[in-house]
């Protein structure tokens, strides 16, 4: 695979993480760049590992992985999105309430895993091609780092406009990504 194809693949794989990061950024009270970078690093690290895991699985049992990865991503994203929507409806904006300035590490890891299962499936497919899987996985991780950090900052802007309802929007985005993954699986 040439460099152009690798870069296009990398940024294509980062789009789900970008959308999820917008939702995450919108739900925080003015996240700092360091929080956006933290999110980008977590999403990028997970997105680097999943094609490597997929590649290894592709060498062993590609049929099972391809058969179930979309369902796993769908369920995780519906769960996380539903949780965000419920949080968004819990009470009005409250001036006395301490605004959230960062997401928990494990929440970000779970979201990153859910949005990177397509990269695992790509890794399975790459097992059957002549590619440098390490370079490809690093390219996907770097693109995801960039796009997730950018997504958090875009989300910051959106969140400052719509306030606590951003939690509902973020949840809807995650559910939308889950539905899109399932739709793409069944309708190509």
Swiss-Prot record:
Keywords: Cell inner membrane, Cell membrane, Ion transport, Manganese, Membrane, Transmembrane, Transmembrane helix, Transport. It holds the Pfam family Mntp. The chain crosses the membrane at residues 3-23, 66-86, 106-128, 143-163, 168-188. The keyword Transmembrane helix applies. It is a multi-pass membrane protein. It comes from the Bacteria. PANTHER family: MANGANESE EFFLUX PUMP MNTP-RELATED. Probably functions as a manganese efflux pump. Belongs to the MntP (TC 9.B.29) family. This is Probable manganese efflux pump MntP. It comes from Escherichia coli O7:K1 (strain IAI39 / ExPEC).
């Amino acid at each position: 695979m040439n460099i152009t194809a690798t870069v296009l693949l990398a940024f294509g794989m980062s789009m789900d993480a970008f959308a999820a990061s917008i939702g995450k950024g919108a739900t925080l009270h003015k996240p700092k760049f360091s929080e956006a970078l933290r999110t980008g690093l977590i999403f990028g690290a997970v997105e680097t590992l999943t094609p490597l895991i997929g590649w290894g699985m592709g060498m062993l049992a590609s049929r099972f992985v391809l058969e179930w990865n979309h369902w796993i991503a769908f369920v995780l994203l519906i769960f996380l999105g539903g949780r965000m929507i419920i949080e968004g409806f819990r009470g009005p904006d409250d001036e006395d309430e301490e605004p959230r300035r960062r997401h928990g590490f494990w929440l970000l890891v779970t979201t990153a895993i859910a949005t990177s299962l397509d990269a695992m499936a790509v890794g399975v497919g790459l097992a059957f091609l002549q590619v440098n899987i390490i370079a490809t996985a690093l390219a996907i991780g770097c693109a995801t780092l960039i796009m997730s950090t950018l997504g958090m900052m875009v989300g910051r802007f959106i969140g400052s406009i719509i306030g606590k309802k951003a939690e509902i929007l973020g949840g809807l985005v995650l559910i939308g990504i889950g539905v899109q993954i399932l739709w793409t699986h069944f309708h190509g």
